[in-house]
């Protein structure tokens, strides 16, 4: 059913398959959902320094960039979150909508789509707030999206630029999939990757994740 001008994508990473191969063989561009306020959910302690709060989302964006250096954001968070069953999360504070969108851009996103235009009044995702709230009126989030757009226009000269990393973290899918069944390996891998990320954030040292395969030079 694909017509001229259509493109195929997805909106997330899947830990039980080779995302790099999927992107190469099945997709025109790789997209991801960015919800940094997961760091502030009811099940998280926002005062825990080790969590790095919303900065921690850049760890996910680094993984996405390893799959597609110039990716897209299918759903960029614009409001409070939560299904009717879980994932309760607060609304972005003034300025955070722009901060989080710029976080995606800084990590290589060439396209940003905010979730969503207006908040739904029913169904499972009725607590996932969009740019407009239930009253469908202009608000500070809409003003901030407009301001974000104006800020982006100032970045025209660097649009399409490649992300420059100071070091790389090597991975491969066989070892990553092994963590799904090997509890010892899972705990060691989680702690190791977390400490590498924390060090890079504290010392402002950018890094890339590189997945090795049979075709790696």
Q: What is the predicted role of each segment?
A:
Residues 1-6, 35-217:
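Carbohydrate-binding surfaces of carbohydrate-active enzymes
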Residues 10, 30, 168-170:
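Short, well-ordered beta-strand segments
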Residues 25-30, 108:
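Glycine-enriched alpha-helix->loop->beta-strand junction motifs that scaffold or abut catalytic
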Residues 11-13, 211:
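Short loop/edge segments at beta-strand edges and connector loops
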Residues 16-25:
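Distinct, well-ordered alpha-helical segments
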């Amino acid at each position: 059913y694909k017509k001229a001008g259509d493109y195929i994508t997805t909106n997330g990473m899947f830990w039980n398959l080779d995302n790099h191969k999927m992107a190469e063989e099945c997709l025109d561009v790789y997209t991801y959902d960015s919800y940094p306020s997961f760091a502030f959910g009811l099940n998280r302690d926002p005062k825990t320094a080790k969590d790095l709060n919303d900065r921690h989302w850049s760890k996910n964006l680094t993984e996405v960039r390893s799959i597609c250096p110039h990716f897209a954001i299918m759903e960029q968070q614009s409001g409070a979150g939560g299904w009717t069953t879980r994932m309760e999360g607060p609304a972005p504070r003034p300025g955070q909508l722009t901060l989080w969108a710029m976080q995606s851009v800084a990590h290589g996103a060439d396209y940003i789509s905010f979730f969503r235009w207006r908040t739904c009044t029913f169904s499972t995702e009725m607590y996932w707030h969009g740019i407009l709230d239930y009253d469908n009126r202009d608000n500070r989030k809409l003003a901030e999206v407009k301001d974000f757009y104006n800020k982006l226009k100032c970045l025209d000269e660097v649009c399409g630029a490649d992300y420059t990393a100071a070091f790389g973290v090597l991975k491969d899918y066989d070892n990553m999939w092994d963590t799904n069944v090997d509890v010892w390996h899972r705990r060691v891998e989680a702690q190791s990757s977390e400490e590498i990320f924390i060090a890079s954030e504290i010392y402002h040292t950018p890094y890339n994740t590189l997945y090795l395969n049979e075709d790696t030079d």
